[in-house]
């Protein structure tokens, strides 16, 4: 029996951080280009950390939502059948609670930004969480996800 922590790490794909970096690096580059370096660097570091933790939280929540939506498909695919929800190691209810908590913490990070950023951040969630459904209507769902991330 796997520990709950290990299951959570697998569920959120924290053991596979490339997705976090794909979300985080465009944010950090945008911040680096936009920041006025004549000001205090502590503000830059503050926003840098907000972007990093926001990326970790939202990518993790997105992975959980993806696994919930795809659980029946994941059970049939060799590469994905051992994912915690597909393997019935984590219930859909538990996964929804985990995802909601991650989104709640991410929301508290998001409200540290200005109004436009909050609106854009909330609207991008709709795009990100629609990704699992794109797999049912196109052979290129990753293109949709890439556009969503950037």
For each feature predicted by the language model, list its residue ranges.
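Cytosolic, membrane-interface loops and tails of multi-pass inner-membrane proteins
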Residues: 1-6, 63-90
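Juxtamembrane/transmembrane-helix boundary motifs in multi-pass membrane proteins
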Residues: 2, 6, 14, 38-46, ...
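Intramembrane alpha-helical segments
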Residues: 9-10, 83-150
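Membrane-interface helix starts
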Residues: 13-23
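Hydrophobic positions within alpha-helical membrane elements
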Residues: 20, 64, 72-75, 79, ...
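Small-residue-rich segments of transmembrane alpha-helices in multi-pass membrane proteins
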Residues: 21-33, 84, 144-150
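Membrane-embedded alpha-helical segments that form the functional core of polytopic membrane enzymes
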Residues: 27-28, 32-69, 79, 103-107, ...
